Amino acid sequence: MQEIQKNTKKEQYNLNKLQKRLRRNVGEAIADFNMIEEGDRIMVCLSGGKDSYTMLEILRNLQQSAPINFSLVAVNLDQKQPGFPEHILPAYLEQLGVEYKIVEENTYGIVKEKIPEGKTTCSLCSRLRRGILYRTATELGATKIALGHHRDDILQTLFLNMFYGGKMKGMPPKLMSDDGKHIVIRPLAYCREKDIVRFAEAKAFPIIPCNLCGSQPNLQRQVIADMLRDWDKRYPGRIETMFSAMQNVVPSHLCDTNLFDFKGITHGSEVIDGGDLAFDREEIPLQPAGWQPEEDDTALEALRLDVIEVK
């Protein structure tokens, strides 16, 4: 009995510690990118996956102690997939007392009609959902649209664009929507997927699997995700350093003439960002810069990604 109580206390301690870390990560992202302002009405896109559940939970937690006032409204898109448990989210949100709206649109039927069997449905599904979410935000009077992408999603997108798109483009923590009417935010931008997985398990969120896109094997994003997880396991700190690199871009040492005026460099120009390393080997630290392992770090098994593709 004492052993059980001891384990329970330890589990609660670890959960509190994990929640504080996630809350700190979300708070820092909100502050760094000015994601939430006084009087904002945040439309929290809730898919029924671990990421969006975690986002809603942390935002609700921050709402209670934030120095500003903002409101939350959870929105779920019921895409009419066969077997979708439509009762789960309403029951969960009513229990929490969270304002919500379930939007019913048969995007599943459209995707199955337009996309040949065996082909990737993500692109079309993403475009359809994006339009519906923008429309719903307008109807609800939302000032911000919150999506549940985390740090690992952002890095995966960067590598996807480098490997397959030939460009260095990630997934911004905050952006203006392509219709120019909505601000999209990603409060989990600084959060590690492994932390979200553990938090979702500890909180026992009623996870709803995605039978439309999650069942498709060999997606390019999944290949990148597996690669990054392998790196994280074999080279601790590498993921943190790569994400830090996205926040420390040096245009003068890349090759994009739109970002830096290379043609304008002439005799007498000032030395920029350390100058030339062509004749000197740059000293690279043996350990990732600024990285400190967490006490409860564990390797994360390969999981289906729970994301709403709005880029």
Swiss-Prot record:
Belongs to the TtcA family. It catalyses: cytidine(32) in tRNA + S-sulfanyl-L-cysteinyl-[cysteine desulfurase] + AH2 + ATP = 2-thiocytidine(32) in tRNA + L-cysteinyl-[cysteine desulfurase] + A + AMP + diphosphate + H(+). Catalyzes the ATP-dependent 2-thiolation of cytidine in position 32 of tRNA, to form 2-thiocytidine (s(2)C32). The sulfur atoms are provided by the cysteine/cysteine desulfurase (IscS) system. SUPFAM superfamilies: Adenine nucleotide alpha hydrolases-like. The thiolation reaction likely consists of two steps: a first activation step by ATP to form an adenylated intermediate of the target base of tRNA, and a second nucleophilic substitution step of the sulfur (S) atom supplied by the hydrosulfide attached to the Fe-S cluster. One of its GO terms (molecular function) is 4 iron, 4 sulfur cluster binding. Its cofactor is Mg(2+); [4Fe-4S] cluster. One of its GO terms (biological process) is tRNA thio-modification. Pfam families: ATP_bind_3 (PF01171). Homodimer. Binds 1 [4Fe-4S] cluster per subunit. The cluster is chelated by three Cys residues, the fourth Fe has a free coordination site that may bind a sulfur atom transferred from the persulfide of IscS. Its main location: cytoplasm. Gene3D superfamilies: HUPs. PANTHER family: AMINOTRAN_5 DOMAIN-CONTAINING PROTEIN (PTHR43686:SF1), SULFURTRANSFERASE-RELATED (PTHR43686). Keywords: 4Fe-4S, ATP-binding, Cytoplasm, Iron, Iron-sulfur, Magnesium, Metal-binding, Nucleotide-binding, RNA-binding, Transferase, tRNA processing, tRNA-binding. It is found in: Cytoplasm. One of its GO terms (cellular component) is cytoplasm. It comes from Salmonella typhi. This is tRNA-cytidine(32) 2-sulfurtransferase. Pathway: tRNA modification. Its EC number is 2.8.1.-.
